[in-house]
C-alpha cells in the first residue's frame, strides 16, 4: 500500500481506512464496506469518465477491502486501464491490483500481458521494473509461457540499466523455479555468466543466484562460471583488492555476494589446478580472517563474518579434497562450540557432523569429544542437544565407542521425549557396529531397554536376538544376563520379550547353576506373564514349549499351565490356539520329534541391519548429498562381526517356517532384483561379461577422485548434476566389501539403471568381484545401494571400471569411473621393533626388491597429514625407528589368496627443498613398484 503523502495523497482512502478501524463491531464494518462498494460501483458505472487519480483511489479501496477478507467481483478492468497510464503511481497501483487479485484464468489476461509487453519494450527503467515485479509476483505457468523468452533478452541487453538487470535476473529465477521446462537455454546463457564480473552489487548478486539454480540442471551451459566465480571471490576477500569495497557491510566486504559465490562453487569442483589453487587461497584467507579479532562489537559484524565463514566451511566439506583446509575448518568450528551465541554453537555442531565423515578430518573432530559431551549435559536448547547427539554419533569409532555410548545412555534418562526414539536407535547401532566384546553389546541393549523401554522398537530387540543367535561366544552370557535382569520387581515388557526368547533358546546353558535351574527360569518368566500384552504372552507360550524340549523335568508344570482354563479358553484366538497346539505337541510327540520340531534356531541370514533402515526412515527421505553414514569404520556387519564376508555365490540358507516359532524374521527380505539371464553361469551378475552397449570413456576428474581414495575408504567417488556415487568399504586380509551408493540428484526417475563392473583381461585372474543387481528404476531424490564382495587372488596393478548406464528424461546417460580397489587396500599393518625393522630391511636389499622415487611435494608438507596418509595407506607407522625423527617409517603385509608379501617403507621429507624421497622394499618387484606409484601420488 503506497504511503499517503501531501503531494499525491488519497484523502478519501485515508478516511475510509480510518472509518474501518473505528468500527465497533463486525456488523458495523460490513455495513461500512458495503456502503463503500456501492459508491465505487456507481462511480465506475456512471456517465462521467473518471480521471486516473480517481481510478487509482477507488482501485486502492477495492484492494484494501480484499485484503480485509471480502470478495471483490468488479474493478478489474479499471485496474487494467491503470496499466496504460504514464504516471508512475497510477501504473504502480494497477500492477499491485493485478498481482494480488487477477488469476491466470481471467478473461483480461491477454490485455494484461499486452500491457506488460509494452512496458518491457518501453525502455523506461521504472516501467520495466514494475512489469518485471508483476511477472515475478504472479509467477504462474501462464506468465512463464508469455515472457520466459523475453526476459533473457532484457537481462543481457547492453543498454539495460543495472536496476532492471537485477529485477530481470530475479524474475527469470522465479519463472525457472516454477516452470523450468519453459525457460529455454540459448545464446544468452554465456552472456549471463559474464554478469559475474558486473560492478553493480545488485546485478552480480542476482545473477549468482540465477546461475546457481540454472547450473544444477544445465551443468554444461554454465561450467565457465567456475573461473569467473573464483576470480570474483578472490577479489572480494583479498584485502589488497578494491573490488566492491563500496559495499562493505560492517567491515565485511560484500558478505552476501561472497556467500552466494561459495554456494555456486559447490556445483562444480574446479577442474583447472590453477583455479583450484586460487580457490584454496580464498578459503585460507577466509579462515585466517576468522581468527582475527573482531573489528566491531556489533552483532551485524559477527553475523556477516560468520555467514561467509560457514559457507566457506560448507564448500571445503563438499569438495573433501584438501586435508589442511578440513583440519583447519574443524579447529575453527571447535572454537565455536563454546561460544556464548546459541546459534553459532548449533551451526558448529551441525557442520562438524559432516566433517566427521571425512577421512582427513575425523581425527580432528574427535579431539572435541569432551566439549560435545559437556554440551549434551549443559545446553538449555533442545535443538543444540540434538545436534550434540548427532555429532557424537558421527565421530564414534572403535576407540571411543564405549565412552560415547555410555554418555548417550546417561543423556537418554533426561532427554526430551521427542528425540528419545532416535537416540535409542543410534545407541543400538553404535553398540552393534563397534562391539569388539559382545558381552558389552548385550549389557548395553539391556540397559537401553531398562532406561527407555517404551522407545525401544521391535527392530532393536529383534536385532539383539539375531546377534546372540549368530554368535556362539555370547549365548551363555546373554542367557545369564537376561535371567538376572528379569529378577527386578518391575521389568519393561521389551525385556520380557528378549528374556523369553533367549532363555527359550539358550536357557540350558545356565541351567547347571542351582540359582537358575529350569524350574526357577520358568517361574521367573511366568511371574511376568499376566502383566504382559497378548503378543508377549504368545512369545512366552512359545518359550514354555521350548522348555519342554530343553528341560523334561519341568514338562508337567508347563502342561498344567497350558491346560488351565485361562489358556485353553482364552478370549484371544492366537493365545488359545498356541495353548491347544503346544499342549497337544507336548503330549503326543516323542522325544525325537519334539527335539526336531523345537530345535535351536539356525543363524539368521545376512542382511542390512533393520535398525539402520529404521533410523534412515526416521531421519526423513535420504538426500543425495547427505552421506551421513559414510563414516570411518565402514558399515555395520550384519552378522555382528567386524570381518567382511568372503565373496561367495552360494545361497544363504534361511530358517524353515516351522522353525520360526516366534515369527522373528525381523526385517523383510530386500526386494528382488531382475532375474539373472538364462545364459548366466550361476553368478547373480556376470560382472566380467562384455556388454553389448558401448562403455563410455572415464568421466572428467575420475582419475583425481580415484587418487583421493588410495588413502581413504569412504566418500563421494563421482558427482555431476544428475548422479552422485558414494562409497563405503572395508578390507581385512585378502577380502573386502564395498558398498556403492547411487544417488539420483534430480526430481525425475532414472530408468533402465544398470551399473556394470568391468575388469581387463590382465586384472580378471587376480581380482574376484561379485555383486548383485540393483533396482532398474531409481526414483527422483532417492538412493540405492549395491554391495560388492572382493577377493584379492594375486597382486595387480590396474583397477576395475564401474560403468553406469541409464535413461534420464528420455536421454541415454553413460558414465564410467575407476573403482578405487588398489593393491594397498589388502595391506595389514605390522608393528616391528627398530632392530627387527632394520634386520628385515637388510634382507630385502636386492636391487629388484627396492623401488625409490624422489619427487616434488604437490601439497603443503604437514607432519600430521603425512602420518594420517601413511596410516590410511594401510601401513603401520613405526615410531622411533629411524634415527632421523623427521622421517617416516612403516611396515605391513600385503595379503592375497595365493601368498603374503611383506613390505617396508621409508619416507624422507626435505622441507627446505619441498621434496620427498620414498623408498619401498618388498619381496616382489611388481608390488614394490605399484605401492611406490600409489603412495607417491599422495604427497
From Swiss-Prot:
Cross-referenced InterPro entries: Adaptor_Complx_Large_Subunit (IPR050840), AP2_complex_asu (IPR017104), ARM-like (IPR011989), ARM-type_fold (IPR016024), Clathrin/coatomer_adapt-like_N (IPR002553), Clathrin_a-adaptin_app_sub_C (IPR003164), Clathrin_a/b/g-adaptin_app_Ig (IPR008152), Clathrin_app_Ig-like_sf (IPR013041)
Residues where a 1,2-diacyl-sn-glycero-3-phospho-(1D-myo-inositol-3,4,5-trisphosphate) binds: 11-12, 43, 53, 57-61
GO biological process: clathrin-dependent endocytosis; intracellular protein transport; postsynaptic neurotransmitter receptor internalization; synaptic vesicle endocytosis; vesicle-mediated transport
CC terms in the record's Gene Ontology section: AP-2 adaptor complex; clathrin-coated endocytic vesicle; clathrin-coated endocytic vesicle membrane; cytoplasmic side of plasma membrane; cytoplasmic vesicle; cytosol; endocytic vesicle membrane; endolysosome membrane
Region spans: Disordered: 612-681
Compartments where found: Cell membrane; Membrane, Coated pit
UniProt keyword Transcription regulation present: no
Domain of life: Eukaryota
UniProt-listed Pfam families: Adaptin_N, Alpha_adaptin_C, Alpha_adaptinC2
GO molecular function annotations of the record: clathrin adaptor activity; disordered domain specific binding; lipid binding; protein kinase binding
Tissue spec: Expressed in the brain (at protein level).
UniProt biased composition (Pro residues): 668-677
Membrane topology category: Peripheral membrane protein
Keyword Membrane: yes
Low complexity: compositionally biased ranges: 646-667
Keywords, alphabetical: Cell membrane, Coated pit, Endocytosis, Lipid-binding, Membrane, Protein transport, Transport
Similarity field: Belongs to the adaptor complexes large subunit family.
Subunit and interaction comment: Adaptor protein complex 2 (AP-2) is a heterotetramer composed of two large adaptins (alpha-type subunit AP2A1 or AP2A2 and beta-type subunit AP2B1), a medium adaptin (mu-type subunit AP2M1) and a small adaptin (sigma-type subunit AP2S1). Binds EPN1, EPS15, AMPH, SNAP91 and BIN1. Interacts with HIP1. Interacts with DGKD. Interacts with DENND1A, DENND1B and DENND1C. Interacts with FCHO1 and DAB2. Interacts with ATAT1; this interaction is required for efficient alpha-tubulin acetylation by ATAT1. Interacts with KIAA1107.
Function (record text): Component of the adaptor protein complex 2 (AP-2). Adaptor protein complexes function in protein transport via transport vesicles in different membrane traffic pathways. Adaptor protein complexes are vesicle coat components and appear to be involved in cargo selection and vesicle formation. AP-2 is involved in clathrin-dependent endocytosis in which cargo proteins are incorporated into vesicles surrounded by clathrin (clathrin-coated vesicles, CCVs) which are destined for fusion with the early endosome.
Name of protein: AP-2 complex subunit alpha-2
Source lineage: Eukaryota, Metazoa, Chordata, Craniata, Vertebrata
Amino acid at each position: 500500500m503506497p504511503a499517503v503523502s501531501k503531494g499525491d495523497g488519497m484523502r478519501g482512502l485515508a478516511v475510509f481506512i480510518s472509518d474501518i478501524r473505528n468500527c465497533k463491531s463486525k456488523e458495523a464494518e460490513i455495513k461500512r464496506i458495503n456502503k463503500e462498494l456501492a459508491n465505487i460501483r456507481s462511480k465506475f458505472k456512471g456517465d462521467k469518465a473518471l480521471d486516473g487519480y480517481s481510478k487509482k483511489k477507488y482501485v486502492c479501496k477495492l484492494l484494501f477491502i480484499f485484503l480485509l477478507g471480502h470478495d471483490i467481483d468488479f474493478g478489474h478492468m479499471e485496474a487494467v486501464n491503470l496499466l496504460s497510464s504514464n504516471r508512475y503511481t497510477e501504473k504502480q497501483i494497477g500492477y499491485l491490483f493485478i498481482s494480488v487479485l487477477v488469476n491466470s484464468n481471467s478473461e483480461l489476461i491477454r490485455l494484461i500481458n499486452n500491457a506488460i509487453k509494452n512496458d518491457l519494450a518501453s525502455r523506461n527503467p521504472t516501467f520495466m521494473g514494475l512489469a518485471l515485479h508483476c511477472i515475478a509476483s504472479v509467477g504462474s505457468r501462464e506468465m512463464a509461457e508469455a515472457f520466459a523468452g523475453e526476459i533473457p533478452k532484457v537481462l543481457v541487453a547492453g543498454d539495460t540499466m543495472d536496476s532492471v538487470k537485477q529485477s530481470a535476473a530475479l524474475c527469470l529465477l522465479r519463472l525457472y523455479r516454477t516452470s523450468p521446462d519453459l525457460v529455454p537455454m540459448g545464446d544468452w546463457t554465456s552472456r549471463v555468466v559474464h554478469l559475474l564480473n558486473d560492478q553493480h552489487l545488485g546485478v552480480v548478486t542476482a545473477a549468482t543466484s540465477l546461475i546457481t539454480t540454472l547450473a544444477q540442471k544445465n551443468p554444461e551451459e554454465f561450467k565457465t562460471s567456475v573461473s569467473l566465480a573464483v576470480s570474483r571471490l578472490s577479489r572480494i576477500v583479498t584485502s589488497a583488492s578494491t573490488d566492491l569495497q563500496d559495499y562493505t557491510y560492517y567491515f565485511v566486504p560484500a558478505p552476501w555476494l561472497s556467500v552466494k559465490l561459495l554456494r555456486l562453487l559447490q556445483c562444480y569442483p574446479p577442474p583447472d589446478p590453477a583455479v583450484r589453487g586460487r580457490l584454496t587461497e580464498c578459503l585460507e584467507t577466509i579462515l585466517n580472517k576468522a581468527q582475527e579479532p573482531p573489528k566491531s562489537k556489533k552483532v551485524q559484524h559477527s553475523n556477516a563474518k560468520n555467514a561467509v565463514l560457514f559457507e566457506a566451511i560448507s564448500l571445503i566439506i563438499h569438495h573433501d579434497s584438501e586435508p589442511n583446509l578440513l583440519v583447519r575448518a574443524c579447529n575453527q568450528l571447535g572454537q565455536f562450540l563454546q561460544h556464548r551465541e546459541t546459534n553459532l554453537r548449533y551451526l558448529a555442531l551441525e557442520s562438524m557432523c559432516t566433517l566427521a565423515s571425512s577421512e582427513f578430518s575425523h581425527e580432528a573432530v574427535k579431539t572435541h569429544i569432551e566439549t560435545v559431551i559437556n554440551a549434551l549435559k549443559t545446553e538449555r536448547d533442545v535443538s543444540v542437544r540434538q545436534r550434540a547427539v548427532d555429532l557424537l554419533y558421527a565421530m564414534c569409532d572403535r576407540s571411543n565407542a564405549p565412552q560415547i555410548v555410555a554418555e548417550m545412555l546417561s543423556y537418554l534418562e533426561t532427554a526430551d521425549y521427542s528425540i528419545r526414539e532416535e537416540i535409542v536407535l543410534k545407541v543400538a547401532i553404535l553398540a552393534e557396529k563397534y562391539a569388539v566384546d559382545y558381552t558389552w553389546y548385550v549389557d548395553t541393549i539391556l540397559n537401553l531397554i531398562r532406561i527407555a523401554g517404551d522407545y525401544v522398537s521391535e527392530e532393536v530387540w529383534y536385532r539383539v536376538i539375531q546377534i546372540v543367535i549368530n554368535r556362539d561366544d555370547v549365548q551363555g552370557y546373554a542367557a545369564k544376563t537376561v535371567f538376572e535382569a528379569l529378577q527386578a520387581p518391575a521389568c519393561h515388557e521389551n525385556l520380557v520379550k528378549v528374556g523369553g526368547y533367549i532363555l527359550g533358546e539358550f536357557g540350558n546353558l545356565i541351567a547347571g547353576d542351582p540359582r537358575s535351574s529350569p524350574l526357577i527360569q520358568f517361574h521367573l518368566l511366568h511371574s511376568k506373564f499376566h502383566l504382559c500384552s497378548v503378543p508377549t504372552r504368545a512369545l512366552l507360550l512359545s518359550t514354555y514349549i521350548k522348555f519342554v524340549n530343553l528341560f523334561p523335568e519341568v514338562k508337567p508344570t508347563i502342561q498344567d499351565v497350558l491346560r488351565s482354563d485361562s489358556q485353553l479358553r482364552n478370549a484371544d484366538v492366537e493365545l488359545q490356539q498356541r495353548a491347544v497346539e503346544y499342549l497337544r505337541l507336548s503330549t503326543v510327540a516323542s522325544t525325537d520329534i519334539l527335539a526336531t520340531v523345537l530345535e535351536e534356531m539356525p543363524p539368521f541370514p545376512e542382511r542390512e541391519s533393520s535398525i539402520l533402515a529404521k533410523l534412515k526412515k526416521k531421519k526423513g527421505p535420504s538426500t543425495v548429498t547427505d552421506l551421513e553414514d559414510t563414516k570411518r569404520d565402514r558399515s555395520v556387519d550384519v552378522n555382528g562381526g567386524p570381518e567382511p564376508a568372503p565373496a561367495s555365490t552360494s545361497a544363504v540358507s534361511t530358517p524353515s517356517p516351522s522353525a520360526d516359532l516366534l515369527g522373528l524374521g525381523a526385517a523383510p527380505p530386500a526386494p528382488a532384483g531382475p532375474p539373472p539371464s538364462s545364459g548366466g553361469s550361476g553368478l547373480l551378475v556376470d560382472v566380467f561379461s562384455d556388454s553389448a552397449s558401448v562403455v563410455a570413456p572415464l568421466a572428467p576428474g575420475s582419475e583425481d577422485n580415484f587418487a583421493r581414495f588410495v588413502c581413504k575408504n569412504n566418500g563421494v567417488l563421482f558427482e555431476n548434476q544428475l548422479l552422485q556415487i558414494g562409497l563405503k568399504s572395508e578390507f581385512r586380509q585378502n577380502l573386502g566389501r564395498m558398498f556403492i551408493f547411487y544417488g539420483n540428484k534430480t526430481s525425475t526417475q532414472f530408468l533402465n539403471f544398470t551399473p556394470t563392473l568391468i575388469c581387463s583381461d590382465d586384472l580378471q585372474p587376480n581380482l574376484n568381484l561379485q555383486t548383485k543387481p540393483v533396482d532398474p528404476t531409481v526414483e527422483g531424490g532417492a538412493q540405492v545401494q549395491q554391495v560388492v564382495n572382493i577377493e584379492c587372488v594375486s597382486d595387480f596393478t590396474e583397477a576395475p571400471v564401474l560403468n553406469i548406464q541409464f535413461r534420464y528424461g528420455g536421454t541415454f546417460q553413460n558414465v564410467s569411473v575407476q573403482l578405487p580397489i588398489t593393491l594397498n587396500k589388502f595391506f595389514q599393518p605390522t608393528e616391528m621393533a627398530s632392530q627387527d625393522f632394520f634386520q628385515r630391511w637388510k634382507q630385502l636389499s636386492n636391487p629388484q626388491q627396492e623401488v625409490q622415487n624422489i619427487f616434488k611435494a604437490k601439497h603443503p608438507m604437514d607432519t600430521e597429514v603425512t602420518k594420517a596418509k601413511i596410516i590410511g595407506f594401510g601401513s603401520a607407522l613405526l615410531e622411533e625407528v629411524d634415527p632421523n625423527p623427521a622421517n617416516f617409517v612403516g611396515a605391513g603385509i600385503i595379503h592375497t589368496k595365493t601368498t603374503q608379501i611383506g613390505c617396508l617403507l621409508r619416507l624422507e621429507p626435505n622441507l627446505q627443498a619441498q621434496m620427498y624421497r620414498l623408498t619401498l622394499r618388498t619381496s616382489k618387484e611388481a608390488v614394490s613398484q605399484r605401492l611406490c606409484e600409489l603412495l607417491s601420488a599422495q604427497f
